[in-house]
Amino acid sequence: MSLEALFNPKSVAVIGASAKPGKIGYAIMKNLIEYGYEGKIYPVNIKGGEIEINGRKFKVYKSVLEIPDEVDMAVIVVPAKFVPQVLEECGQKGVKVVPIISSGFGELGEEGKKVEQQLVETARKYGMRILGPNIFGVVYTPAKLNATFGPTDVLPGPLALISQSGALGIALMGWTILEKIGLSAVVSVGNKADIDDADLLEFFKDDENTRAILIYMEGVKDGRRFMEVAKEVSKKKPIIVIKAGRSERGAKAAASHTGSLAGSDKVYSAAFKQSGVLRAYTIGEAFDWARALSNLPEPQGDNVVIITNGGGIGVMATDAAEEEGLHLYDNLEELKIFANHMPPFGSYKNPVDLTGMADGKSYEGAIRDALAHPEMHSIAVLYCQTAVLDPRELAEIVIREYNESGRKKPLVVAIVGGIEAKEAIDMLNENGIPAYPEPERAIKALSALYKWSKWKAKHKEK
């Protein structure tokens, strides 16, 4: 059954809605309203009556069965013991998809697993889908849908985020806002009683608003199916996975956290590799890669050019490129074009060192030439902040030149410096140009793009 109703519901019921700040039923109502959801919202609470949130008055229905119209999605926020009955009513009502926020099921052990299985059977009886239980909700920015108790102001963009951990997922939403990473969707999967990562991958594969997918997982329900689906999706869009529970202690923690069987870590690594999935080991690394993979075009060749104003960061970037197996373009005849943008003591050998005297004009000319050259396939622009050029001015130059070139090549930026450098990085990221405060991070993100692109080329025809 399609997941269309999960991401584009025409109406949403919040079962366990509340007008009391601090309650999850209040936070979900507030987020739906504040994020601009345009469908109908129906609060449901056994107490009935009327509630007012953000100046909007709502009639409260005592049961989902009392709602006169069709309900596409019902978000359940009642204590675990009431969930089976509420879900039965959702089925009778013809609700299509039910995110169950409530916890106290499979993660508690055998008894909880039995109840969870009953929920799945109820859902199947009515042809209904369940997300969760034990989740924080779902966001889909193209539909202005924020049915979570996480941050309200999620930035729209091309990255879909799937998280098995609730608290971490909410924290990651906050991180993306701070780091200027735009999201198409955020989905909390929790115990994955029904809808799992593979189902979501199938949806995002054909979702035109999603260019890359990032998953935090502790384990998979059906390893074979996940790998088969991931392999198909990877031929079209990149998937980055943070797989936790790598150690024995970590695996035990995962089991008590979301009821996941973590499985052998080596098996996961091998399976990811086969399926074209990029495995990240830290949150920072995953988002660094996601920036590049969700915003940049695929490289049309192996030649990378590094443009810098400082020998130091140029050398560090070169080391990182060598470690990652990237090929630095070394045709000196062609690299000579950069001599026009540097003093006589500069170096046009790759890395191209414009020297500490580099101003806006130097960078503008060098970036323009690199973007226009048919044999230069990817570009890393590095800048050590000096008094000669305000980093924000450099950001404007990069944005302008990249846009005017038609964004046909991958381009990453690293700016090392103070507060102005941070502002410049934010400007670039807001404009879909991956920018970082360290050269190695920029190079590794570019490398992730190459790894996926090469895997895809190898498997495309098979």
Swiss-Prot record:
According to the record, how does pH govern the activity?
Answer: Optimum pH is 9.0 (at 80 degrees Celsius). Optimum pH is 7.0 (at 55 degrees Celsius).
Instruction: Please name the source species.
Output: Pyrococcus furiosus (strain ATCC 43587 / DSM 3638 / JCM 8422 / Vc1)
Protein name, per record: Acetate--CoA ligase [ADP-forming] I subunit alpha
Regarding temperature, what does the record state about activity? Optimum temperature is above 90 degrees Celsius.
Location(s) in or outside the cell: Cytoplasm
Gene Ontology CC, one term? cytoplasm
InterPro entries tied to this protein? AcCoA-synth-alpha (IPR014089), CoA-bd (IPR003781), Ligase_CoA_dom (IPR043938), NAD(P)-bd_dom_sf (IPR036291), Succ_CoA_lig_flav_dom (IPR032875), Succinyl-CoA_synth-like (IPR016102)
Molecular function (GO) terms for this protein are: acetate-CoA ligase (ADP-forming) activity; ATP binding
Q: Which UniProt keywords apply?
A: ATP-binding, Cytoplasm, Ligase, Nucleotide-binding
Q: What does this protein do?
A: Catalyzes the reversible formation of acetate and ATP from acetyl-CoA by using ADP and phosphate. Can use other substrates such as isobutyryl-CoA, propionyl-CoA and butyryl-CoA, but not indoleacetyl-CoA, phenylacetyl-CoA or succinyl-CoA. Seems to be involved primarily in the conversion of acetyl-CoA to acetate. Participates in the degradation of branched-chain amino acids via branched-chain-acyl-CoA esters.
Would the keyword rRNA-binding be found if you checked this record's keyword annotation?
no
Q: How is its activity regulated?
A: Activity is dependent on magnesium.
Q: How does it assemble?
A: Heterotetramer of two alpha and two beta subunits.
Family recorded in the similarity comment: Belongs to the acetate CoA ligase alpha subunit family.
Q: Spell out the reaction equation it catalyses.
A: acetate + ATP + CoA = acetyl-CoA + ADP + phosphate
Enzyme Commission number(s) of this protein = 6.2.1.13
This protein's source sits in the domain of life called: Archaea
Q: Which Pfam families match?
A: CoA_binding_2 (PF13380), Ligase_CoA_2 (PF19045), Succ_CoA_lig (PF13607)
